[in-house]
């Protein structure tokens, strides 16, 4: 074959290509194949036997493998050639910083899309700074062609300090929002004004737009009064036990309470002390709907007032006692379908529920009292409110509706700091989340169509659509954009233009904390990369992805290569903060979720038992007991590490701090700077788990290790309305909370203490307690994890009802449906059931203690010391 034959030409070009002293990226490989596509086609179509043709075909078929091998050899050689350069890179700044091999490989890798997975305490900022320095000094990249992006101003300042100040390299470091704003400025002839707080426009909508439009006001009030509280039917529970626990920790408060119209003076049946109730607390959101309807229509009622006729000593509390004229009516609401029962209950439980309904019906028939009934659902498709209205009108109760404008006025004036404000904040949160996903107006109609069978969601979406249109109109009129627009509008601008139509002179886009990226930021990054041919370097750790509530989507990190089309995944596994024992515990814990990227972090130091679970007695004086346990941990730290050791107190929520401050063992002398009265020289900082991310302290105390709605893991349920637009990680139970707990565990350089109540420990701790190198103090593994107080009759949680229609302080009642279990007690130790007094008929037999003998007995609440009351008493065996 002659020298100009296709095979020889391809071989020569390939040898020049593969022997270049550089890392070959996929784009460069693609360009090579595209430039030589005609040669490749000729070779494939004109096969003949020769050594050159076999060699050319081998190149065509295996060029990707050869490029990978070339890159590995190149990096291996560069590690040797650049060793002295890397060794000395930080010597003028900090002689203790020495880049490890994984960091150096990450710096030398020049793939188009690279993901650097940097474990906690592995020197992520150091790696990014070193990468920039290498690009500028070794690859002669102009600093103006490098864009470094992080998420917070604090993180931006840290990168600027390291790169701009220490290395004297003038690369641009920016937040995503500032980056988007700068892009918009390139195509704007006028100054761009940014709205920093959406509250002013949204509040204006309520105060001006809403109250002057009768139809809109009517629709708003209907939703607000009857549907703002989340119906339990809209929530998902893994078990019936979880459902009852949810009911236990939620207060269902009526509109009458919220408007200040509920104010009752009560005399405690047992102690005879007088107290005032200013809140009407119901059992369910459906009961709140009924109470609100009665209140709005001027129907007088009492909630759970004892039925006047005794039946074999059983206490019967009808849901509503209704008064109209001289007549008294009773209304029972049943939390099942009129015919179909409730799918939360099994067949036996539904049978017992029906039996309870029949019993109440017979009781009212026997005493000739009028009973009305409502159900959670009906076969005719009408809602609860429609059937309630029919029941009331059928029984001759006249409904006189309050004026809607008066209700709204009273609502906005009396609830500015509570319920009404909560709804405005909910609207702000919804619109922010809606826009952060890049949704436009048309998305409302799509969402309404998707959820057309959910009346509550549809009502809110229609309201939110009108609010969104008003909000966007006000932005436009005032020439404003909000923070979401900085990113959304810049993406919209870029996706409609071609290369060369905008000045985006970037060769590298380096993104810090990439695990926190949202879809709108991802889309913007891809468009900038498309228009500038910039390489994208994503740096982060999926184990620390904890900002889903702000729109972050961890799958954009874990599926980086798939979403980009290809890429290189690199790991930095040496951690310089934690001990090997601690990262083994934390790593095992977070990798219980198989969707997390597998990695084995390596530490330079060893410390036996770095995780200490500290139990405290939560039976009495919980606040002091918890604070005392924290103080004991500080004492141990001082004894082991001295009083110069820095201590971080981590809470799940900011209010965890106040549980400590209320104990009088601690005080706050500056924002989040805490002093212990017993150890005043110790430097103590308080941060939430989210705020602690990225920081390191000598020792850490996690002060909230409890189970519950505000525990760790947090069990706050999102409103289902938010869930339709929220990013949810359902890969594992409490997936994000598990990652957040990992963040909290890894803030320490030495030990982490976790404070937990002995009777209600976090489920995370019941898991950790069996791990190697986890120590438990002030308790034992045997008694660790006693559960909450349960009903002795049905085993569901007991709810404390300080204010109740029986006028018994500290009453505990079963959280189960009344039709299934009516257990009530006033003593959690003995758990004897309260019953109607058989002697006086209007008192109740409750647990009392003899002042002299200290023995317990059942005594009537109508007892009086002068013997003028009821003296009925029973011995407790």
Roles of regions detected by a PLM:
Residues 2-193, 746:
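P-loop NTPase Walker
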Residues 8, 12-22, 27, 145, ...:
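Conserved P-loop NTPase-based nucleic-acid remodeling module centered on helicase motor cores
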Residues 44, 51, 61-120, 127-128, ...:
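Conserved helicase NTPase motor core
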Residues 116, 122-128, 273, 566-567, ...:
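Helicase P-loop NTPase motor core
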Residues 243-249, 642-646, 681-682, 687, ...:
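Conserved helicase C-terminal RecA-like lobe
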Residues 317-357, 454, 530, 542-544:
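Short beta-strand-loop-alpha-helix junction that forms the active-site gateway
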Residues 348, 356, 361-362, 522-613:
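Conserved RecA-like helicase ATPase core segment
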Residues 722-732, 739-743, 749-830, 873:
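Helicase C-terminal subdomain and adjacent C-terminal extension
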């Amino acid at each position: 074959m002659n020298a100009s034959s296709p095979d020889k030409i391809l071989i020569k070009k390939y040898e020049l290509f593969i022997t270049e002293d550089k890392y070959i990226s996929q784009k460069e490989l693609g360009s090579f194949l595209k430039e030589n596509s005609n040669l490749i086609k000729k070779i494939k179509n004109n096969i003949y036997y020769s050594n050159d043709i076999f060699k050319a075909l081998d190149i065509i078929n295996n060029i990707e493998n050869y490029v990978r091998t070339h890159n590995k050899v190149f990096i291996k050689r560069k590690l040797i050639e650049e060793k002295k350069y890397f060794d000395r890179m930080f010597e003028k700044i900090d002689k203790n910083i020495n880049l490890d091999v994984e960091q150096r490989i990450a710096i030398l890798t020049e793939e188009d899309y690279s993901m650097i997975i940097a474990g906690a305490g592995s020197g992520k900022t150091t790696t990014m700074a070193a990468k920039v320095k290498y690009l500028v000094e070794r690859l002669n990249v102009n600093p103006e062609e490098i864009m470094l992006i992080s998420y917070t101003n604090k993180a931006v300042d840290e990168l600027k300090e390291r790169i701009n100040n220490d290395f004297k390299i003038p690369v641009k470091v920016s937040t995503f929002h500032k980056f988007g704003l700068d892009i918009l400025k390139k195509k704007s002839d006028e100054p761009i004004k940014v709205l920093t707080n959406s509250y002013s426009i949204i509040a204006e909508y309520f105060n001006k737009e809403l109250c002057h439009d009768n139809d809109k006001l009517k629709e708003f009030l209907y939703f607000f009064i009857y549907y703002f509280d989340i119906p339990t039917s809209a929530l998902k529970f893994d078990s019936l036990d979880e459902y009852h626990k949810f009911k236990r920790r939620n207060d269902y408060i009526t509109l009458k309470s919220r408007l200040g119209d509920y104010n009752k003076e009560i005399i405690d049946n047992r102690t005879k002390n007088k107290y005032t109730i200013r809140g009407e607390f119901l059992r369910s959101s459906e009961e709140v709907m009924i109470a609100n309807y009665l209140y709005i229509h001027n129907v007088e009622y009492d909630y759970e007032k004892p039925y006047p006729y005794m039946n074999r000593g059983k206490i019967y509390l009808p849901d509503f006692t209704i008064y109209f004229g001289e007549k008294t009516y009773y209304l029972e609401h049943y939390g099942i379908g009129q015919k179909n029962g409730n799918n939360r209950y099994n067949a036996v439980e539904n049978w017992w529920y029906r039996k309870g309904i029949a019993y109440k019906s017979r009781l009212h028939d026997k005493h000739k009292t009028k009973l009305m009934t409502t159900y959670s659902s009906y076969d005719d498709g009408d809602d609860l409110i429609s059937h309630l209205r029919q029941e009331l009108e059928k029984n001759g109760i006249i409904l006189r509706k309050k004026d809607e404008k008066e209700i709204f006025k009273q609502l906005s004036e009396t609830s500015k700091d509570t319920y009404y404000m909560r709804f405005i904040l909910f609207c702000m949160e919804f619109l922010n989340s809606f826009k952060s996903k890049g949704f436009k107006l048309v998305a409302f109609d799509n969402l309404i169509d998707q959820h057309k069978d959910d009346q509550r969601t549809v009502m809110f979406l229609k309201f939110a659509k009108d609010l969104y249109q008003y909000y966007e109109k006000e932005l436009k009129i005032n020439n404003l954009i909000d923070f979401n627009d900085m990113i959304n509008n810049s993406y919209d601008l870029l996706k409609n233009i071609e290369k060369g139509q905008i000045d985006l002179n970037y060769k590298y886009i380096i993104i810090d904390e990439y695990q926190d990226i949202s879809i709108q930021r991802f889309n913007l990054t891809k468009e900038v990369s498309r228009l500038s041919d910039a390489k994208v370097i994503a740096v982060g750790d999926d184990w620390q992805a904890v900002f889903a509530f702000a729109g972050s989507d961890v799958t954009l990190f874990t599926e980086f290569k798939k979403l980009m089309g290809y890429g290189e995944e690199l790991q930095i596994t040496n951690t310089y903060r934690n001990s090997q024992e601690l990262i083994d515990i934390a790593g095992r814990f977070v990798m219980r979720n198989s969707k997390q990227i597998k990695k084995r972090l390596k530490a330079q130091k060893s410390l036996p038992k770095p995780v200490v679970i500290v139990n405290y007695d939560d039976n009495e004086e919980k606040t002091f007991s918890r604070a005392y346990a924290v103080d004991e941990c500080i004492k141990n730290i001082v004894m082991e590490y001295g009083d110069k050791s820095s201590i971080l107190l981590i809470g799940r929520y900011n209010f965890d701090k106040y549980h400590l401050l209320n104990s009088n063992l601690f005080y706050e002398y500056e924002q989040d700077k805490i002093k212990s009265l017993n150890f005043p020289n110790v430097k103590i900082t308080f941060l939430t788990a989210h705020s602690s991310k990225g920081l390191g302290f000598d020792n850490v105390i996690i002060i909230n290790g409890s189970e519950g709605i505000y525990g760790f893991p947090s069990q706050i349920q999102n409103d289902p309305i938010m869930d339709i637009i929220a990013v949810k990680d359902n890969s594992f139970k409490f997936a994000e909370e598990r990652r957040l707990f990992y963040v909290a565990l890894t803030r320490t350089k030495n030990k982490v203490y976790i404070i937990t109540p002995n009777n209600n420990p976090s489920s995370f701790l019941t898991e950790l307690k069996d791990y190697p190198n986890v120590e438990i103090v002030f308790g034992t593994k045997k008694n660790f994890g006693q559960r909450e107080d349960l009903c002795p009759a049905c085993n569901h949680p007991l709810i404390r009802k300080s204010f109740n229609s029986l006028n018994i302080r500290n009453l505990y009642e079963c959280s189960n449906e009344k039709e299934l279990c009516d257990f009530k007690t006033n003593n959690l130790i003995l758990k004897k059931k309260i019953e109607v007094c058989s002697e006086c008929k209007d008192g109740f037999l409750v647990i009392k203690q003899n002042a002299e003998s200290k023995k317990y007995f059942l005594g009537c609440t109508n007892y009086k010391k002068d013997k003028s009351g009821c003296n009925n008493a029973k011995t407790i065996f």
